[in-house]
Amino acid sequence: MKKKITETSSIMFSSPKNQQSKQYINENVWDDQYLIDVYEKSINQYIEAHNEKNKKNRNKNKEINNVEDDISNNNNNNNSNNKTIDNNKNKIGSKNNINNNSTTTNTNKNKINKQKQQQQNNLDKETDTKDDYNSGDYYNEYEDDNGEDNDYQERKGYYQSNKDHDYYHNGENNYQNQYNPNYFYQSQHYQQQQPPQNFNNQYQPHHHHHHHQQYPNHHSYNYNREQYQNPYSQPPPTPTNYPPMQTNFQPPPMPTILPQGDDELADLLLSWYYSGYYTGVYQERKRNSRLNQTPHPNHINHHRYNNNNNNNNNNNNNNNNNNNNNNNNNNNSNNNNNNNNNNNNNKSNSNSNNKKLPKFTNIPKTKETN
């Protein structure tokens, strides 16, 4: 897809629209007309953006648009205010109706309650007067000047005092523990710590009455203690499947065999090589070169090293065998020496036995005692 493109003396390529007098023809240049058009468009946009006339027109348009936006916002605000006023009026009217209805209902209820109270009071008075008339006392001795019944007040106070007494003794209003901040927590904790009572298993044989069955131990936990007491006792995390890092990594030398007759492929090969990627072409050439070339000196040294190790091992084995033979010979010589010593000892013993004892002729005679 190569084409003849005109080239100027400058760095950038010239488009066919702006052809200058100095033109050079180069057949090895790719057709980048699309990129040239994009560059021209971007340059024209930059020039238009920094043109003063265009700036003034843009500022005017912005001012006009801002004024129009302000007018529209004011209209919207007025409409919203009118709507809120209407809604408030409707709410106020509904509230007034509700209040009127509620006041009427409340007044009716109060009237009914007053009538009921009057009827009950009349009944109480009638019963009291009947009792007084039957007992001979037509008048009420317990009424004050104001007409209040002292007996009713005393009875009312008696009931209230009894209620307070029960309330205090039931613990609902415990004044002693009122200023104890831990009272509520202690009572709640005590209720929670009570063991469950199983009445079915209450009468069991003797071997069933164990402490740990009816009352479970408070040290029984549902979690592993070692996990919290010694966090370092956990096993280490499993290693990932990533390959280990190569510390002594040495890249191979730059390939000396380049494709002949194809400069573009050679450029690509060098660019990919320097960027860290190896192409399939280089890998194929490397495989072919392995078949034709001599092995790498490192590989030769490696084999030599292995051969030397094997030879050294064989020599060591031979030396060990020789040492074992020498040890055996030494043992044999020691055995021979021991045998010779035994023979000498036997001879000396026999000689000592064959010797004659000396004759003691001058032994003094003892006197016989009567």
Curated annotation (Swiss-Prot):
Coiled-coil region(s): 39-135
Stored CDD domains: SMN_C
GO MF entries: RNA binding
Region feature (Disordered): 1-21, 66-154, 189-218, 291-370
Protein location: Nucleus, Gem; Cytoplasm
Ranges of Low complexity composition bias in the record: 72-122, 189-204, 306-354
Principal location: nucleus
Compositionally biased intervals (Polar residues): 7-21
GO biological process, one term: mRNA processing
Pfam families documented for this protein: SMN_YG-box
Cellular component annotations (GO), alphabetically ordered: cytoplasm; Gemini of Cajal bodies; spliceosomal complex
Biased composition (Basic and acidic residues): 123-133
Acidic residues bias (residue ranges): 140-151
Keywords tagged on the record: Coiled coil, Cytoplasm, mRNA processing, mRNA splicing, Nucleus, RNA-binding, Spliceosome
Family: Belongs to the SMN family.
Task performed by this protein: May play an essential role in spliceosomal snRNP assembly in the cytoplasm and may be required for pre-mRNA splicing in the nucleus.
Listed name of the protein: Component of gems protein 1
Organism of this sequence: Dictyostelium discoideum (Social amoeba)
Lineage summary: Eukaryota, Amoebozoa, Evosea, Eumycetozoa, Dictyostelia
